[in-house]
Amino acid sequence: MIRAVLLLLATAIAAPPATLGVDPFYAKYLDAGGIPILSSAMAPDEALAAAHDIVADMLAARPDLHAWLVQQRYRVAVMAADETTTDLPEQRGWTRPAATDPRLTRCERLHYAERIGRLTDRQYWDARARGMAGPLTSAAAENLLAGPRDRYHGENIFVHEFAHDVLAAIRAADGRLYARVDAAYRQTLAAQRWQGEYASTTVDEYWAVGTQFWFNSGRIATFDTVHVLSDTDLTRYDPALAVTLRAAYGDRHHLLADRFWDSPDRVPPGPLPRYTAEVC
């Protein structure tokens, strides 16, 4: 049934309208309630349809946030498996982050020279990212479709990246809710939750990782005897975060077009490590 809906959506794909004023790189277009879903001719139609449905479902409970993203001209670009982050016209000139960039993880800061400093700008971004948030949010077709070349197999990276956009809308359009998200993040740091995990890096990553678990679409996180894999686990482990996620997404925990929803691939084979945080 879900595949049939995606295939039906795919038949609505057309060339981008001239009014969008996009680069000729973009040959395909779907409209997600005013948020353009774009790609080159190389991306499969079904991947655009999946991105469309995920956007619609993540914003369903908050039309005000949807309206803000439309007003700010947010758009989504789906990369084909053979395309890279810097193939996208808006990202061709991206440079590497500096060693002082607050978005770097502690391991990236510790090993900056080896992991980042020795690479060209293009080498860094093409190795680092198969999806980015922002006014142009990108997604990888192979991840949206859980394909064989998916380097992030086991989690939906687009759910994570679009969650950043949702938080940007909250920050601008619902200051009270954003204050609650920020307070939850400060509380979680003080309580030493998510220690060493990507969620501890910034309030933005805290929200995006939490969103993945809210929608049962993130790789398992382990903290000794505590495991976080589902929305139920998340609510138990970080109730303050769960309350704010509910305020944005309602009680929905399943994005129908998400291939990794409740997937066994979210748990790696073999014995689980005591802690999934990177050791550096």
Regions of interest found by a model, annotated:
Residues 2-12:
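Sec-dependent N-terminal signal peptides
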Residues 3, 65, 216-219:
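Short amphipathic alpha-helical segments with coiled-coil-like heptad repeat character
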Residues 6-7, 61, 214:
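A very general structural signal that marks isolated residues within well-ordered alpha-helical segments
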Residues 10, 14, 121-124:
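Intrinsic disorder/low-complexity segments
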Residues 16-31:
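Short N-terminal segments immediately surrounding and downstream of signal-peptide cleavage
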Residues 21-24, 38, 94-103, 110-140, ...:
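Metalloprotease/metallohydrolase-associated module, dominated by Zn2+-dependent proteases
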Residues 25, 32-35, 44-186, 224-227:
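Acidic/His-rich structured neighborhood in mature extracellular/periplasmic domains
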